[in-house]
Amino acid sequence: MAGLSIWHVVIFAIVVILLFGTSKLKNIGKDVGGAVRDFKKSVREEDEAASLNSPRTIDAQVKTSESTSVKS
């Protein structure tokens, strides 16, 4: 079983261009690019939301002072 040579790819590209035309291929490219961009945006938004909701630790020192109270 032989792999794809450069000629196979060239012939396939020519057939696709003849079938669909360059304008349809350009529109398909725009649609695919927009879908990829939207997917990346949604993944980025989910990562930001997850980082905002993640538990955080706060390091602090508590200072106590003694107070005297008088009960009457």
Curated annotation (Swiss-Prot):
Q: Which InterPro entries match?
A: TatA/B/E (IPR003369), TatA/E (IPR006312)
Q: Which Gene Ontology terms cover its molecular function?
A: protein transmembrane transporter activity
Q: List the disulfide bonds.
A: none
**Mainly resides where?**
membrane
Localization, UniProt: Cell inner membrane
Q: Which spans are transmembrane here?
A: 1-21
Q: Does the keyword Protein transport apply?
A: yes
- Region (Disordered) residue spans: 47-72
Per UniProt, which keywords does this protein have? Cell inner membrane, Cell membrane, Membrane, Protein transport, Translocation, Transmembrane, Transmembrane helix, Transport
Which membrane topology term applies here? Single-pass membrane protein
Family statement drawn from the similarity comment of this UniProt entry: Belongs to the TatA/E family.
Q: Can you name this protein? A: Sec-independent protein translocase protein TatA
Give the originating organism. Acinetobacter baumannii (strain ATCC 17978 / DSM 105126 / CIP 53.77 / LMG 1025 / NCDC KC755 / 5377)
Gene name of the record: tatA
